[in-house]
Amino acid sequence: MSVVILDFGSQFTRLIARRLRELGAYSVILPGTASLERIAQENPQGIVLSGGPSSVYDANAPRPAPGVLDLDVPILGVCYGMQFLAHEAGGAVQRAGKREYGKADLTRYGGQLFAGIQGEFVAWMSHSDSVTQLPQGYEVIAATEDTPVAGIENTVTRRYGVQFHPEVVHTPKGGQLLANFLEICGVARDWNAEHIVDELIEDVRRQVGAGRVLLAISGGVDSSTLGLLLARAIGDRLTAVFIDHGLLRLGEREQVEAALRPLGVNLVTVDASEEFLGALAGVSDPEQKRKIIGREFIRAFEREARKYGPFDFLAQGTLYPDVIESAGGEGAANIKSHHNVGGLPEDLAFKLVEPFRTLFKDEVREIARLLGLPDAIRMRHPFPGPGLAIRCLGEVTREKLDILKRVDDIFISGLREFGLYDGCSQALAVLTPIQSVGVMGDERTYSYTAALRAVTTDDFMTAEWARLPYEFLATMSNRIVNQVHEINRVVYDITGKPPATIEWE
C-alpha cells in the first residue's frame, strides 16, 4: 500500500514524498506519464499530481496515462496538478492576470483538506496560470487576495486540488493538510524506521541467500549504515573494505574502526596512502586529481576483492534520489554507479544489492540511529569522495595535507564546541596556495592562507553561506594561527551557490 506521486517536473516533488513519509505513509515517485500498469504495481491508496512548469492548455502539456483519473482512489493535485484536474473535468484554466510567487495568506479556507486547521494559513505560491471556471461537482475551498480559486474539492469523486505548495516549509500548516489527505485515503501510517529495518533485513536475506557480499566503506553515513544493516542480516558473510587513501580527515580511519567493529561489521582497513599520493604527485588540476583518485580506488578495491573473495554480491548505498534522477519515461531506473566502484573489471561483475534504493537520506540517518551508529558519523556533514585532495588547492603533498587536517579539525571541533555544527549543512577548511607576509612575535612570516567555509541548504542544489558569529570566527582564526604555525592568515568564504560551488575544487 502506498501513495503514488506522479511527477510533472516540479522542483518540490521529492519534498512531497518526504513529507508523506514523515507522516508515516510510504510514498513512491513515478514519472507523470507512467502507465496504468506501472502505477498499479504500487497498489496505491492515493495519488498526488505534482506541480510543474507546463500549462495545461498547451498542446504538448504532460498528462497522466489514460485511465489514471478513473481509478477509485483519492487524488490530490498540487499547482499544475490542480489545474489539470480542473481542466480535465471541464473547467477553465487561463494565464493569471497577476502572477503569484512567494508567501500569500489564504483569505478563506475549508473543506475536507483543511479539517481541524485553524487560524492564519500562510501558503507558498508559485504559479502563472489559474483556474477561472470550476468544473461541475467541484467547490472552492481556499482563496487568496489575488487567486479566488486557490483550492478545490469534489467530495463525491474524492478529487482535491491546491494552488500552492503544502510540502514546503514556507507553508507552515501544509503538513496538517497532507495529513488530512492521508486520512481521506485511509492509508495505514506505519512507515517508520523500525518497520523499515525489519523489512530491509528480510529483503537482504531473501536476495542474498547463502551468498557473500562485498561493500566499500567510505566512512560516511550511507555506507556505514549499510555495513551495520548487512552485518545484522548476514553476519560475517559481509566483508566491508575501508580504503585509507591518505586524504581523510584527522583520526577518521580510527573513528570508523571504533564505530563499526564493535557492532559486528567484518571490516578490513587498507592503508593505500603511498599509492594515492604517489599517483597525485605533481598534479594540480582538480579534474585530473579526481580521475586519478577514482582510478587508484578501483585498483585498490579490486585487489582486496580478489584477496578476500570470491563474492557473489556488491553492496551499494544507492539512495532514492539517485533512482529518481536516473528513471526513464516509464519509471525504469538505470542506477548510477557509485563513484568508487563503477569501474570494476568484467570478471568481478557482481550482482548488486542496494537495500537503500527506496530511502531518503533522513530515513537512512534514522536507521543508523536504531542500529547504534555513533552520532559523530550519523550526523556528519557530507564529505567528498576525493577527500581532502580537492580542499588542498594545487599539488597534494603529505606536508600540505598535514596542515589542512589540523586546520579542519580545529574548525569542525570549534563548531561542535560552540553548538553551531548542526546548524550548518556543510562546513570545511581549504588550504590555498596563497602565501602572504605576516608577523608572529618579532619575526616576519611568509605562510599559507587558510579559508573556512560553512553553508546552509535544504537540497545542496543551492546554498547560502552560514552567518557564523563574528566572535566564533575570531576565535577560530586565533586558534588556527597559534596552533598551526604554517598558517598566518585565515579568511571566511561568504559566497553562495550559485555563483560558487560548495567545494572549492
Swiss-Prot record:
HAMAP family recorded: GMP_synthase
Molecular-function GO term, any one: ATP binding
Q: Any keyword Nucleotide-binding?
A: yes
Q: Relate the protein's function as given in its record.
A: Catalyzes the synthesis of GMP from XMP.
The residues covered by the GMPS ATP-PPase domain are 191-380
GO cellular component terms given for this protein: cytosol
Which intervals hold domain Glutamine amidotransferase type-1? 2-190
- The catalytic site is made up of 79, 165, 167
Q: Which residues bind ATP?
A: 218-224
Q: What is this protein called?
A: GMP synthase [glutamine-hydrolyzing]
Its UniProt pathway annotation is:
Purine metabolism; GMP biosynthesis; GMP from XMP (L-Gln route): step 1/1
Q: What is the source species?
A: Deinococcus geothermalis (strain DSM 11300 / CIP 105573 / AG-3a)
EC number(s): the record gives 6.3.5.2
Give the top-level enzyme category: ligase
Q: Where is the signal peptide?
A: none
**Keyword hit for Repeat:** no
Catalysis performed (reactions): XMP + L-glutamine + ATP + H2O = GMP + L-glutamate + AMP + diphosphate + 2 H(+)
Q: Name one Pfam family in it.
A: NAD_synthase
What quaternary arrangement does the UniProt entry report? Homodimer.
* Keywords assigned by UniProt, alphabetized: ATP-binding, Glutamine amidotransferase, GMP biosynthesis, Ligase, Nucleotide-binding, Purine biosynthesis
